[in-house]
């Protein structure tokens, strides 16, 4: 219903557990000739599907969820997925101005660009350590309990590489970032150069009483 309100015509749904031969679903999709094909799966299955779809002459744009967010997608599908769209709660490290030095240090140490969620993992660890420090202080220097650390995490406000993090009473981030991204190159080594198409800042849903 919401798609219709946005002027989007959903031409059909196809489901499969196939991982190698997608002809049974590619044929009817090609006949309908949609503007866009959304694949709700993960990169290894999607890569084979997208590659076969292009080989069968399908010209539609491709899109998928955060299960696409892996350089292995281009390693498997190559040029077939260049220009496709995917959504993720994590953008490439290049979209975060404060993460520039982190990216440089990461590449210097590991000889490659940071993988998806690397900057988020850094922020998570740093926030956790800050919360543990606060829990230690609140416990008078004694070893805090798991519950005390959990409470401290929810109270911690942290200015991270990726965003400013603050939690609500449920433990959810008060605001979450959501990205629409586009694959920039068929080269897996350039996955970190994927383009940010749109960024959404979404508030956490209210606590139901």
Residue ranges and their predicted role:
Residues 1-209:
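Extracytosolic ligand-binding ectodomains
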């Amino acid at each position: 219903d919401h798609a219709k309100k946005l002027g989007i015509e959903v031409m059909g749904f196809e489901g499969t557990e196939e991982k190698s031969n997608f002809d049974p679903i590619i044929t009817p999709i090609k006949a309908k000739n949609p503007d866009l094909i959304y694949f709700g799966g993960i990169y290894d299955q999607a890569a084979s599907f997208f590659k076969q779809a292009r080989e069968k002459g399908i010209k539609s744009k491709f899109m998928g969820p955060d299960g696409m967010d892996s350089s292995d997608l281009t390693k498997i599908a190559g040029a077939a997925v260049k220009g496709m769209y995917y959504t993720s709660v994590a953008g490439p490290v290049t979209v975060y101005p404060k993460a520039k030095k982190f990216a440089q240090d990461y590449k210097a140490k590991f000889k490659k660009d940071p993988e998806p969620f690397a900057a988020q993992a850094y922020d998570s660890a740093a926030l956790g350590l800050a919360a543990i420090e606060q829990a230690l202080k609140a416990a008078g220097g004694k070893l805090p309990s798991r519950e005390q650390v959990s409470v401290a995490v929810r109270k911690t406000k942290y200015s991270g590489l990726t965003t400013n993090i603050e939690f609500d009473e449920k433990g959810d981030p008060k605001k979450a970032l959501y990205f629409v991204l586009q694959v920039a190159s068929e080269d897996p080594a350039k996955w970190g150069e994927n383009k940010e198409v749109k960024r959404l800042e979404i508030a956490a849903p209210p606590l139901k009483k």
